[in-house]
Amino acid sequence: MDNNIIIGAMTALITPFKNGKLDEQTYHKLIKRQIANGIDAVVPVGTTGESATLTHEEHRICIEIALDACKGSSCKVLAGAGSNATHEAVSLAKFAQEHGADGILSVTPYYNKPTQEGLYLHYKEIAKSIDIPVLLYNVPGRTGCDLQTETIIRLFRDCENIYGVKEASGSIDKCVDLLAHEPRMMLLSGEDAINYPILSNGGKGVISVTSNLLPDMISKLTHFALEEKYIEAKKINDELYNINKILFCESNPIPIKAAMYIAGLTPTLEYRLPLCKPSDCNLAKIEAIMKNYDIKGF
């Protein structure tokens, strides 16, 4: 497992649409741009990829495109494979493995509010259905349930292919507590605002929204921190403060998709309802802040 774990700078990919349908050509180009700018892994069909409003067929196509785009490169594919129905999550995980994904990211079940025992059994079922690495994903602000430290550690110790967790609870204390109790755990930041604090407290990588727009900066920040060059890492983190903040002025991925469109990286600005375009006020703020950054094209 040690040789197969997926850490470092990762991008939670947006899913571009054109005339209401998946824009496969743009999606492929966006991934190639990530690879060219030093990203270690891409994460298709997660929260940022609007997975909740994709059909199962679109979900699978996104994974296939990511695998094709990363072929022959060192960039890995950590495929989104989450659902609030365990059997669906298992099916998505199996698809990812069968098609060559390097690992899966699986969010906690949303809406049905399982107990900690239910969460344990959910992830145990997913883990035993595949052989590739599994990264837990805790984002209670969106799912309505919090994967507690004790449950994370229990899963890590009981399931050989569960290697870590993407923590997006916003709690540095929880992250420090987790690593204090299980230092072998691979902890990844799931929130751009706290990338540096997590990396400087033992985290092993980030799954970033901002890196859709600025993959080179997120890659440098992450690798400086992993090399314990904390002064250099903090300098980049400070430079990213304003863009990180504005990219969450509305629900993710509303602002990042707007930013990608403004930067000319996507030909259209489309969402799947109930997500919609940002307010004119926020759109103007996003555009103004973007002028302070060197955003690389294709």
From Swiss-Prot:
Entry annotation: catalytic residues: 137 (proton donor/acceptor), 166 (schiff-base intermediate with substrate)
Keywords: Amino-acid biosynthesis, Cytoplasm, Diaminopimelate biosynthesis, Lyase, Lysine biosynthesis, Schiff base
GO MF annotation: an example: 4-hydroxy-tetrahydrodipicolinate synthase activity
Record pathway: Amino-acid biosynthesis; L-lysine biosynthesis via DAP pathway; (S)-tetrahydrodipicolinate from L-aspartate: step 3/4
InterPro entries: Aldolase_TIM (IPR013785), DapA (IPR005263), DapA-like (IPR002220), Schiff_base-form_aldolases_AS (IPR020625), Schiff_base-form_aldolases_CS (IPR020624)
Residues at which pyruvate binds: 48, 207
Domain of life: Bacteria
Assigned EC number: 4.3.3.7
CDD domains the UniProt entry points to: DHDPS
Keyword Amino-acid biosynthesis: yes
GO cellular component term of the entry, any: cytosol
HAMAP family for this protein: DapA
Catalyzed reactions per annotation: L-aspartate 4-semialdehyde + pyruvate = (2S,4S)-4-hydroxy-2,3,4,5-tetrahydrodipicolinate + H2O + H(+)
Subunit structure: Homotetramer; dimer of dimers.
This protein's name: 4-hydroxy-tetrahydrodipicolinate synthase
